[in-house]
């Protein structure tokens, strides 16, 4: 994700290096390159234009601070603006003072709602919560079965009514079940469509009106670029969503949706998903992503992944074995398996500052 954009920014920063001051003359070409880089990454035109304008305002005429060269100044300005356009700060998922907290997932068909429901349930379970998955997609034949399988895989409860096509009945009885099992979160997986239509919106509006969800998350396919932004804008206008989830951000995704959705739709990105595994879910932190785009790494996320994947007691045992020269192949294999839990090696490398991952 964002590899091409990151490479473009590196080239731009190299061109700025060696300047004694950030002036209109040496900024003109750099800002033009920034705008082109953003547009090539499928960033919304208006967002790209505003982004460049703000950089120009901050950069032009700034005196070089003692010990900081113009390139470093320019990098900081770009970084700060990236953080802002991505949303500024992390917006956490809602938590109702009275259980359960109800989360409704919405979106078009194929965006990955059902899979994300499983990922979110696993994430919440890892935080000590008790989630219940409700299958309210009554149109896709395999949806309810898929939800049940995912629930079993992540070791949480699920609720569906195979013979019912009444989403309100399913949600009502599902919430009754949530009370019986003392669920702290309820995740409602709704039906998608190939395109936005009145029936889809009417059904979602009905769930919203009848069950008052604390979160209405729109799940969008990050690979669709500008289409994802347009979908987010339309859903927000009709449903007043509380946040966006970007899926499928692995592979060759250009990243335009992530850089545009907050400013265009006016709602924060709350989660991103960069892979197919049920662990591939992360709360969205604008500052961390901005640092990764600019090649600064993301040490905080790296440490968090390590804490989740590495058993502290096991790590202390390994340390003792190292000191006593008793570390063997079986121990090496255990260490390797723990590292594998952190994700792909390529993903880990991207979080380390200064490591070139373009090769």
Regions found by a protein language model. Give the residues of each.
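Primarily NTPase-proximal linker/entry elements flanking Walker-type ATP/GTP-binding cores
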Residues: 9-136, 143-163, 170-190
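Conserved phosphate-handling catalytic cores of large alpha/beta enzymes
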Residues: 171-172, 179, 183, 195, ...
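Alpha-helical scaffold segments in soluble metabolic enzymes
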Residues: 4, 11, 33, 77-84, ...
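Conserved phosphate/pyrophosphate-binding and hydrolysis machinery centered on Walker-type P-loop NTPases
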Residues: 2, 20-28, 41, 45-49, ...
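Long amphipathic alpha-helical segments used for membrane anchoring, targeting, substrate engagement
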Residues: 2-19, 288-359
């Amino acid at each position: 994700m964002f590899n091409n954009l990151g490479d473009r920014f590196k080239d731009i920063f190299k061109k700025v290096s060696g300047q004694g001051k950030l002036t209109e003359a040496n900024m003109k070409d750099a800002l033009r390159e920034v705008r082109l880089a953003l547009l090539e990454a499928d960033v919304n035109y208006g967002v790209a234009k505003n982004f460049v304008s703000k950089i120009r305002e901050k950069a032009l005429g700034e005196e070089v601070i003692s010990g900081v060269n113009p390139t470093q100044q320019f990098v900081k300005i770009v970084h700060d603006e990236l953080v802002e356009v991505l949303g500024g700060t992390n917006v956490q998922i809602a938590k109702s003072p009275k259980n359960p907290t109800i989360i409704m997932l919405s979106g078009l068909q194929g965006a990955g709602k059902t899979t994300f429901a499983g990922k979110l349930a696993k994430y919440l379970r890892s935080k000590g919560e008790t989630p219940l998955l409700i299958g309210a997609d009554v149109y896709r034949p395999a949806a309810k079965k898929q939800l049940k399988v995912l629930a079993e895989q992540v070791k949480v409860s699920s609720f569906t009514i195979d013979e019912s096509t009444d989403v309100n009945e399913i949600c009502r009885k599902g919430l009754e079940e949530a009370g019986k099992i003392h669920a702290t979160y309820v995740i409602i997986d709704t039906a998608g469509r190939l395109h936005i239509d009145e029936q889809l919106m009417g059904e979602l509006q009905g769930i919203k009106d009848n069950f008052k969800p604390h979160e209405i998350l729109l799940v969008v396919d990050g690979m669709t670029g500008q289409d994802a932004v347009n979908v987010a804008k339309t859903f927000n206008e009709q449903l007043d969503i509380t946040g966006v989830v970007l899926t499928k951000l692995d592979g060759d995704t250009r990243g335009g949706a992530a850089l545009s959705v907050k400013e265009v739709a006016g709602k924060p990105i709350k989660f991103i998903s960069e892979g197919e595994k049920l662990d591939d879910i992360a709360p969205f932190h604008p500052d961390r992503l901005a640092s990764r785009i600019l090649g600064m790494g993301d040490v905080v996320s790296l440490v968090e992944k390590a804490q989740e994947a590495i058993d502290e007691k096991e790590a202390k045992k390994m340390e003792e074995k190292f000191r006593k020269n008793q570390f063997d192949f079986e121990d090496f294999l255990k260490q390797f398996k723990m590292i594998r839990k952190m994700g792909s090696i390529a993903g880990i490398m991207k979080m380390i500052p200064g490591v070139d991952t373009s090769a």
